[in-house]
């Protein structure tokens, strides 16, 4: 198969400097990004679904996606974004993460049904012809990143030459994780319920401009001084944070080794992605977390520290808004949430336990049991306003099998009965809303083996179509199980 190459600008710069003495690392001059010219074959699941509905436009769902497309969460996370990215990846040259870090947990399965729980590595990694990019908007915990790579390679997944990490991405240190726990302890009754992965403190370092970036690993002569500032800042803010010069020395030595191993992965991903767009390469953006956890648009302060909505694609990858096309919103057939924060449609007692057990609702990253409730149309419409979704992937429809009736939260009212016209930004208002429900009939049939939309029970189809009517966005993909093939194309 013939190959085209896209050289790293870092490689060109290294070559231009000649053999003059330098105290910092540069990328090898021969380093390049290689793409297969021919698109990999469509997965069997897609081919089978297409063959089954040959006369239906559904066969074009995957191939008709725009050059730059995105998969974003449209609730509070854990919707099943990784599975859809894994299914779509063979149709794309690049899969890119634009924000977040190891707080995101994406569970995917290979063709043999083996489970992979990814946190930072993009979900396209299981497909040999796909290049995976971790953009500048992400935060990189280097030991965790290497741990994921080691786990993948020990299971036969080749990562060498297939992952690029932005030189502009910020480094997340163990100290950020320590600070995360100390801050949660200080908040006491205002417990936010973070993943304790250090995400918030790392983004805080970024905003206060004392954070370190991946490119700083190429300047180890000044790395220690910059890290010293970070350690001292943490020690000045938290009494429980112990710091010494020996700790700093140990961490610097540790990162010298990390720098050597990480070097082949480092690239100017802004350049790589924009050059790829010019070359008509197809890019799939994989969002972490979800819109209702967005730092600006989520249920603040019970949110993440980045922008997992459409705007985060541009700021987290360095690509222009005009090049972004289809955005697929991934929405669970019910709702779940990890940690604290408002949850208007939450179910308690046996009803909540039933959804939690049937859906195996335990966090990929934390293992914590997720809070569960009915589908919230008000929140979903709000997410659509922010992101402009072209379609939905409705996941875990099979979990609702066996219910005699299914409720959908269609509107909010104040305690005095006044109906709200939009999703409230004020937390006090949101905590007091009364949810108005629409009741739909359930179905008793196990639908986990269904692969054609018309074969779903009538009540299941009614549920899907009612969601489309209420929100005004078509459902193109329906998940009926965890496996790669457990997907219906509508």
Swiss-Prot record:
Q: Which InterPro entries match?
A: Adenylosuccin_syn_GTP-bd (IPR018220), Adenylosuccin_syn_Lys_AS (IPR033128), Adenylosuccinate_synth_dom1 (IPR042109), Adenylosuccinate_synth_dom2 (IPR042110), Adenylosuccinate_synth_dom3 (IPR042111), Adenylosuccinate_synthetase (IPR001114), P-loop_NTPase (IPR027417)
Q: Which GO terms describe its biological process?
A: 'de novo' AMP biosynthetic process; IMP metabolic process
Q: According to its UniProt record, which cofactors does this protein need?
A: Mg(2+)
Which of this chain's residues are annotated to bind GTP?
Answer: 77-83, 105-107, 370, 396-398, 479-481
Q: Which UniProt keywords apply?
A: Chloroplast, GTP-binding, Ligase, Magnesium, Metal-binding, Nucleotide-binding, Plastid, Purine biosynthesis, Transit peptide
Pfam families, A to Z: Adenylsucc_synt
Q: How does it assemble?
A: Homodimer.
Its function, per the record, reads:
Plays an important role in the de novo pathway and in the salvage pathway of purine nucleotide biosynthesis. Catalyzes the first committed step in the biosynthesis of AMP from IMP.
Protein name as annotated: Adenylosuccinate synthetase 1, chloroplastic
Species of origin reads: Sorghum bicolor (Sorghum)
Its ancestry begins with: Eukaryota, Viridiplantae, Streptophyta, Embryophyta, Tracheophyta
């Amino acid at each position: 198969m013939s190959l085209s190459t896209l050289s790293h600008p870092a490689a060109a710069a290294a070559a231009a400097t000649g053999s003059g003495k330098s105290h910092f690392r540069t990328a090898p001059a021969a380093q390049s990004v290689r793409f297969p010219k021919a698109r990999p074959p469509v997965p069997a699941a897609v081919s089978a679904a297409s063959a089954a509905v040959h006369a239906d436009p559904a066969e074009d769902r995957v191939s008709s996606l725009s050059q730059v497309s995105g998969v974003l969460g449209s609730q509070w996370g854990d919707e099943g974004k990784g599975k859809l990215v894994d299914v779509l990846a063979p149709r794309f040259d690049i899969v890119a993460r634009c924000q977040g870090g190891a707080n995101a947990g994406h569970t995917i399965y290979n063709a043999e049904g083996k489970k992979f729980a990814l946190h930072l590595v993009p979900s396209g990694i299981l497909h040999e012809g796909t290049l995976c990019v971790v953009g500048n908007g992400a935060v990189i915990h280097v030991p965790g990143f290497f741990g994921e790579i080691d786990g993948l390679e020990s299971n036969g997944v080749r990562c060498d030459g297939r992952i690029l990490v932005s030189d502009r991405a910020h480094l997340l240190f163990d100290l950020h994780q320590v600070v995360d726990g100390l801050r949660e302890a200080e908040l006491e009754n205002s417990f936010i319920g973070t993943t304790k992965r250090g995400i918030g403190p790392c983004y805080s370092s970024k905003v206060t401009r004392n954070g370190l970036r991946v490119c700083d690993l190429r300047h180890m002569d000044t790395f220690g001084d910059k890290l010293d500032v970070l350690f001292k800042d943490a020690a000045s803010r938290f009494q429980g944070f112990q710091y010494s010069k020996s700790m700093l020395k140990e961490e610097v030595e540790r990162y010298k080794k990390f720098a050597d191993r990480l070097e082949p992965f480092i690239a100017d991903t802004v350049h790589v992605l924009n050059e790829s767009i010019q070359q008509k390469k197809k890019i799939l953006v994989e969002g972490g977390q979800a819109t209702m956890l967005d730092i600006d648009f989520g249920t603040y302060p019970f949110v993440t520290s980045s922008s997992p909505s459409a705007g985060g694609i541009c700021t987290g990858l360095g690509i222009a808004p005009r090049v972004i096309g289809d955005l697929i919103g991934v929405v669970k057939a019910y709702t779940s949430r990890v940690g604290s924060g408002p949850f208007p449609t939450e179910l308690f007692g046996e009803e909540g336990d039933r959804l939690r057990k049937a859906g195996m609702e335990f966090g990929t990253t934390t293992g914590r049991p997720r809070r569960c409730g009915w589908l919230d149309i008000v929140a979903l419409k709000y997410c659509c306003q922010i992101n402009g979704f072209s379609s939905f992937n409705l996941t875990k429809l099979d979990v609702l099998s066996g219910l005699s009736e299914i409720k959908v939260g269609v509107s909010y009212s104040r305690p005095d009965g006044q109906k709200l016209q939009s999703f409230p930004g004020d937390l006090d208002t949101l905590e007091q809303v009364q949810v108005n429900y629409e009741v739909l009939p359930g179905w008793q049939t196990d639908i986990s083996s269904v692969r054609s939309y018309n074969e779903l029970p009538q009540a299941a189809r009614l549920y899907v179509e009612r969601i489309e009517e209420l929100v005004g966005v078509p459902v193109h993909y329906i998940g009926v199980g965890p496996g790669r093939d457990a997907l219906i194309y509508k």
